Swiss-Prot record:
Family matches, as PROSITE patterns: MYOSIN_MOTOR (PS51456), SH3 (PS50002), TH1 (PS51757)
Subcellular location: Cytoplasm, Cytoskeleton, Actin patch
Compositional bias annotation for Low complexity: 1015-1056, 1226-1240
Pfam families reported for this sequence: Myosin_head, Myosin_TH1, SH3_1
Species whose genome carries this gene: Coprinopsis cinerea (strain Okayama-7 / 130 / ATCC MYA-4618 / FGSC 9003) (Inky cap fungus)
GO biological process: actin cortical patch localization; actin filament organization; endocytosis
Modifications made to the protein after synthesis: Phosphorylation of the TEDS site (Ser-360) is required for the polarization of the actin cytoskeleton. Phosphorylation probably activates the myosin-I ATPase activity.
This protein's encoding gene: MYO1
Domain named SH3: residues: 1071-1129
Ranges of biased composition (kind: Basic residues): 1-13
InterPro entries recorded: Kinesin_motor_dom_sf (IPR036961), Myosin_head_motor_dom-like (IPR001609), Myosin_TH1 (IPR010926), MYSc_Myo1 (IPR036072), P-loop_NTPase (IPR027417), SH3-like_dom_sf (IPR036028), SH3_domain (IPR001452)
Biased composition (Pro residues): 1057-1068, 1132-1142, 1204-1224
Biased composition (Gly residues): 1241-1258
Name recorded for this polypeptide: Myosin-1
């Protein structure tokens, strides 16, 4: 609503406030001071004095202030503003959605919301009855109710949306064909309609049906001065297309007698051209085909041209057609013979009967007056049947597509009419309004008081006028009423309308005994509830017969237009002796059916009032409105409402609706009350805290006095489900937090171990390559053995690695494998002898590097580079030795024969790089090619006298027995059980484990609801134990590690050292509360926490809107978050340190710089995560990110059939997982060091590299570190 401006006050436009200006809260606060103040009372039951004058004064105050709606309890009073107040926008509509009438100002949307809510909540049909004078705003109210229901009824299905569109499209279509301008209303409904919208059990519209009542067809052929015909005629004549004008000979509205006789062609605020476009669009939405639309317009053109047929009187006094060209065009439109049209309009066929047998047939000429009546009768019949056809077509389109459960009906019917000349049409209209008033009285006054007496409710009777006596005066048969007298007059003098009218006058004289009827010769007076109306008898019996003469029906029967013939499906049977139903019969039958429908639904009332007869937005006619207040019975309605009860229902339905509100009648959503429905209903009302004077218990029903009480019950019921939903959501969120915490733990473990999995996959691939054909060394099968590849750390840029990389000129080429090895070297005149080397494997080649001494410095040089594409096969023996040969093609240098501790890993990486394109042979002997293509062979012999490794001498390798050939890696060693932190973040468990279930209150047995035959099946109570319940356990003693897995001790002294006791577990911490301290003073309002500076509060819940739920002294309330600062949690006491463990003494001798042979202890036993470097310092476990897999550029020949495809061994670099802010991590691992590893000890890089023997000094340092690690594991075990 726009802010009101005071006179003479300058209003400065406000500047935009950036993004904050878009906030809904800020916008509402800005408007708070500009809201229009309420004038008068919104509910007239609150008036201090109850009189017609006080009601009128309250309505006038509100209407003058632009507030046209006022309540009397649940009845809405609407005063037509005759202007657009902007109160039907989408924004206003949304404010009424889901609100009861006490939460928002009075509005027609509130009535629509109440009807829709009650239908869904109570599963009862609803109807909205709109009554009032013509021009009071009934049609507009019905349109807004339909608009609201279409907006809130949901349903995204295309079929449901189509139903909504078609329901809304009926408004412009029926307004065009059924509304006209009258002296009192520019858009007066000249018919009545009852729209029934069908809904499924989800509250979605699935169909609709329209019932039409009493179209004022007489308006087609005549209107009084300054009124108009139906809108469609002016729309059609003004906005028809050129094709239509050509086909139908169409001209402007001034060219036709039916549209120009009242001298009113245009109406202010009505655009006929624009409305015609809306009519065409509505026809398309409803589903009328272009052919059907064309036939409709042809019928309209036929009616217009029929009105232009004029009659002259000849010498004999008979009628003749003035212009036969008009009748010729009418015959063209009706597709009949022109002569037949002329004859049907100017003559009448009369048939005589004699003794019940057919006699002679005569053509009786008609005088001009009779011919004009026949012409008008034909026009009225065509238009009336056309309107009925359109309504039937709409109902076919709106037919339900699926099953429906409930209905909302909207009654928009003609208002009470009092004119200077009142005839049969006004009698029927006022009769229907009398019936509606009777329904209002029956349901709101008479029936209600009778129910109070029947239910023995304390009640003060209210006197009121019951208009049933007026309804009986019009519709009763015995004694005969007005309609019965009309029918008798038509039956006795059916041939002569004048004689029939005189007969009716005589018969109606007998009705004078009724105090509400008065006969005055050719007129009679009826005292309606809305006032006294004088009716003229002339022509009333003819209108009551409402039938075409046989000649005109025969004319239509000869038409070649099938559409025209379909408009008249029922032809009277000339041989039938049964009297055809009259217009009064049909209107009485329709009104009775309407009353039956309305009585089967729960009604909502809208009483419309017309403020003046000039359609002025500023004129308030106090006298006219006071008259409407009186005949609408608003004063009696207020008295009954104040003395009565707003809501009543049977005990069974009350219990079924509200049993959830009492803990004695419900448990976990089940009905548990064992008493009768009445006692259960009384228990519910007591437990909800409702005052005793607000409700009474009757014989079969419970009565609630004020609607506020009912709304409170509904709010509590809605909150019950909301609270239950919140509990379920809270439990689900706890479950999700628990689940996410478990997932995070798994993810952390995975991030810390996923690289190890990659290395283990490569190791398993190595097992597949060997395929149980070669004996294994025990240390090759350790569970912690990983195929890490680059043992010389060439990719890591260590000092040794840089030297080797420069010697090989690797550049950016990634290194897949590097280690120390021995190469079998042949010397002139001497037997071959192993010599230390370094071997490097890249995706392109194998590099063999030799170290020589020059001037006391180590010099690295590339001895040989072997391209991978030149390697044909690899050979190994079946024993546990370390020898293998790379068989190449014809070369001068021959095949290299190498001995390497990591031979299996080298072969595995080589097979991966070549996609298993190399033959891999394992046999008791290996063959290789020496220089100049000389063949040689090495034999392998088992020799148990060899203490360890193997010994080469004269092409024979002596090797001890190893592990069986089918051996695989040992399973991972069991870690020592420590104190596991329980997963309690989701609050599913208390710290320390789950609590025992509370069995203090047994689960009640479910009972059947009142009206049910079988009790509801009780859901078994299932107590589920979360998976986190078992995570807190006492530390178990470490299981002994098998000898095959545990590394041997190095010295006896180390074995004698007892293992240290495990550290004590940390004290079990109580659940940590998140505490905050107030930074400033804060004065809270209702629902807010008042704070004093330095107050300490416990945080319960955070909300995104800036308010936090806190707890202080056992009270929970909301506080602004920026007034609080967190109190740092107290650090948990550290556990006592474990006793110091004596450091084992290593007996591994440090290799001298001049050593040239490998020491036996230099053999690597395993590769462990976090193993020491050559100098005993820490070494990162993961490989460098520079190491990647690649494939040789050239393709290789096919390999042997026994090849195993390598697994994908990608090595992603794990991201560093940072701890969550604000969450302490006691005992967490420190971050990995980011600096480079220190250089090996022993007197500098050169000194460390000049070591000889076996695997080289670098390998010796590595072996020493491994030995220390093995000793440490042995000590721990």
């Amino acid at each position: 609503m726009a802010p009101s401006k005071k006179a003479g006050k300058k209003v400065t436009p406000k500047k935009a406030a950036g993004n904050n200006a878009k906030s809904k809260v800020a916008k509402a606060d800005w408007k708070e001071g500009f809201k229009k103040k309420q004038v008068g009372v919104t509910d007239m039951t609150l008036l201090t004095t109850i009189s017609n004058e006080s009601i009128n004064e309250n309505l006038q105050k509100r209407w003058t202030n632009g507030e046209i709606y006022t309540y009397i309890g649940a009845v809405l009073i609407s005063v037509n503003p005759f202007r657009d107040l902007g109160i039907y926008t989408d924004e206003v509509l949304q404010r009424y959605r889901g609100k009861n009438r006490l939460e928002v100002p009075p509005h027609v949307f509130s009535i629509a919301e109440s009807a829709y809510y009650n239908m869904n909540a109570y599963h009862e049909n609803q109807c909205v009855i709109i009554s009032g004078e013509s021009g009071a705003g009934k049609t507009e109210a019905a349109k807004q109710i339909m608009q609201y229901i279409a907006a809130v009824s949901g349903g995204q299905d295309s079929g449901i949306q189509e139903i909504k569109d078609m329901v809304l499209a009926t408004n412009p279509l029926l307004e065009s064909f059924g509304c006209a301008k009258t002296l009192r209303n520019n858009n007066s409904s000249r018919h009545g309609k009852y729209l029934e919208i069908m809904f499924n059990d989800r509250g979605e519209p699935v169909g609709a049906q329209i019932t039409n009542y009493l179209l004022e067809k007489g308006r087609v052929v005549g209107q009084i001065e300054n009124e108009r015909n139906f809108h469609i005629f002016y729309q059609f004549t003004k906005a028809a297309s050129d094709e239509q004008r050509e086909a139908f000979g169409l001209q402007g509205p001034d060219a036709y007698a039916y549209t120009s006789m009242s001298n009113c062609l245009d109406v202010q605020d009505i655009d006929d051209t624009r409305d015609f476009e809306g009519t065409i669009n509505a026809m398309q939405i409803i589903g009328l085909s272009p052919e059907e639309q064309n036939e409709i317009f042809k019928m309209l053109a036929t009616i217009l041209w029929l009105g232009n047929v004029q009659f002259d009187e000849n010498e004999e006094g008979n009628s003749v057609i003035s212009d036969t060209g008009v009748t010729d065009f009418v015959a063209y439109l009706m597709e009949v013979d022109a002569a037949t049209v002329q004859k049907a309009l100017t003559t009448r066929v009369m048939e005589t009967t004699r003794g019940g047998r057919r006699g002679s047939v005569y053509d009786v000429p008609l005088n001009p007056s009779q011919a004009t009546s026949g012409r008008d009768a034909l026009s009225k019949a065509i238009y009336n049947n056309l309107f009925e056809w359109i309504v039937a077509k709409i109902n076919v389109s709106l037919k339900t597509r699926s099953a429906y459960s409930h209905i909302i009906g909207i009654l928009d019917i003609f208002g009470f009419e009092i004119f200077e000349d009142n005839s049969f049409e006004q009698l029927c209209i006022n009769y229907v309004n009398e019936k509606l008033q009777q329904i209002f009285i029956e349901l709101t006054l008479k029936t209600e008081q009778e129910e109070y007496v029947r239910e023995q409710i304390k009640w003060t009777p209210i006197k009121f006028f019951n208009n049933k006596v007026v309804c009986d005066l019009i519709e009763e048969r015995r004694p005969p009423g007005i309609f019965a007298a009309l029918n008798d007059a038509c039956a006795t003098a059916h041939a002569d309308p004048t004689a029939a009218d005189n007969s009716f006058i005589q018969r109606s004289a007998g009705l004078s005994s009724n105090g509400h009827f008065e006969s005055r010769g050719a007129q009679f007076l009826v005292r309606h509830y809305a006032g006294d109306v004088m009716y003229n008898v002339a022509g009333m019996t003819d209108k009551n017969k409402d039938s075409l003469i046989k000649d005109l029906l025969d004319l239509i029967g000869t038409s070649g237009n099938a559409f025209l013939q379909n408009l008249f499906p029922d032809r009277p049977d000339p041989n039938s002796k049964k009297r055809p139903p009259t217009a009064s019969d049909r209107i009485k039958q329709s009104a009775g059916a309407l009353v039956d429908k309305l009585m089967k639904s729960q009604p909502s009332y809208i009483r419309t009032i017309k403020p003046n007869g000039n359609r002025s937005p500023s004129e308030y006619d106090t006298k006219a409105i006071l008259h409407q207040i009186k005949y609408l019975g608003l004063q009696e309605n207020i008295r009954v409402r104040r003395a009565g009860f707003a809501y009543r229902n049977t005990f069974e339905k009350m219990v079924e609706r509200f049993y959830l509100l009492s803990p004695k009648t419900s448990y976990a959503g089940e009905y548990i009350w064992t008493g009768d429905a009445k006692s259960g209903c009384e228990q519910i009302l007591k437990d909800t805290g409702i005052a005793k004077d607000e409700w009474q218990m009757g014989v079969t029903k419970a009565f609630i006095k004020n609607p506020e009480t009912l709304f409170a019950l509904e709010t509590m019921r809605d909150r019950y489900w909301h609270n239950m939903a919140a509990r379920i959501q809270r439990a689900f969120r706890n479950y999700m937090r628990y689940k996410h915490e478990c997932a995070r733990r798994i993810q952390r473990f995975w991030k810390n171990n996923k690289e190890a999995l990659v290395y283990a996959q490569v190791r398993d691939y190595g097992h597949q390559l060997l395929a149980g054909r070669k004996e294994r060394r025990r240390f090759s099968l350790l569970s912690y053995r990983r195929f890490m590849g680059d043992y010389l750390d060439i990719s890591g840029k260590s000092s040794l690695g840089e030297e080797i990389g420069e010697a090989c000129s690797l550049g950016r080429e990634p290194v897949k494998f590097s280690a120390s090895a021995r190469l079998l070297v042949s010397k002139l005149g001497r037997s071959s002898k192993p010599s230390p080397r370094y071997i490097v494997l890249t995706p392109k080649a194998v590099y063999i590097v030799i170290v020589t001494a020059k001037d006391g410095q180590a010099m690295f040089s590339l001895e040989r580079k072997i391209a991978l594409v030149t390697i044909k096969s690899i050979q190994m023996s079946t024993l546990r030795d370390d020898w293998f040969t790379l068989n190449l093609g014809p070369t001068e240098e021959g095949d290299p024969v190498l001995s390497c501790y990591f031979k299996t890993e080298f072969v595995t990486h080589l097979m991966q790089l070549t996609q298993a394109g190399i033959n891999f042979n394992i046999a008791p002997t290996i063959e290789y090619t020496k220089k100049k293509e000389k063949k040689a062979q090495i034999k392998f012999v088992k020799d148990e006298t060899i203490p360890k490794d193997d010994v080469y001498k004269s092409h024979t390798v002596h090797v001890p027995s190893g592990e069986p050939a089918d051996s695989v890696s040992r399973p991972p060693a069991k870690r020592k059980a420590g104190v596991v932190r329980p997963i309690t973040q989701g609050k599913l468990l208390r710290a320390g484990g789950p609590s025992k279930p509370n069995n203090s209150r047994p689960r009640p047995t479910a009972q059947p609801l009142p009206g049910q035959s079988k009790p509801a099946v009780a859901t078994p109570s299932v107590v589920s134990t979360p998976a986190a319940a078992a995570v807190v356990s006492k530390p178990k003693p470490a299981a002994s590690t098998p000898a095959a897995v545990r590394a041997p001790a190095v010295t006896p002294a180390a074995r004698s050292v007892p293992p240290p006791p495990p550290p004590p577990p940390p004290a079990r911490a109580e659940p940590e509360k998140e505490m905050y301290r107030a930074k400033f003073d804060f004065q809270g309002q209702e629902g807010e926490m008042s704070l004093t500076k330095d107050d300490e509060v416990e945080l319960i819940e955070k909300d995104e809107n800036g308010w936090w739920l806190v707890k202080k002294d056992g009270v929970e309330a909301w506080a602004p978050y920026n007034y609080l600062e967190r109190i740092a949690p107290k650090a948990a006491p550290a556990p006592p340190p474990p006793p110091a463990r004596p450091r084992p003494t290593s007996t591994v001798p440090k290799p001298p710089l001049s050593s040239t042979t490998a020491d036996a202890s230099a053999k690597p036993v395993a590769v462990f995560p976090g193993m020491g470097a050559s100098n005993g310092g820490p070494t990162p476990w993961k490989k460098s990110a520079a190491t990647t897999d690649s494939t040789p550029n050239s393709s290789r020949p096919g390999s042997a059939a026994a090849k195993v495809p390598p697994p994908v061994a990608a090595k992603p670099k794990p991201p560093v997982v940072a701890p969550k802010p604000g969450v302490p991590k006691p005992g967490g691992k420190p971050a990995l060091p980011t600096t480079a590893r220190p250089a090996p000890s022993g007197g500098g890089a050169a000194a460390g590299r000049l070591g000889g023997g076996g695997g080289g000094p670098g390998q010796l340092d590595l072996a020493a570190a491994l030995a220390k690690r093995a000793q440490r594991i042995a000590d721990e075990d």
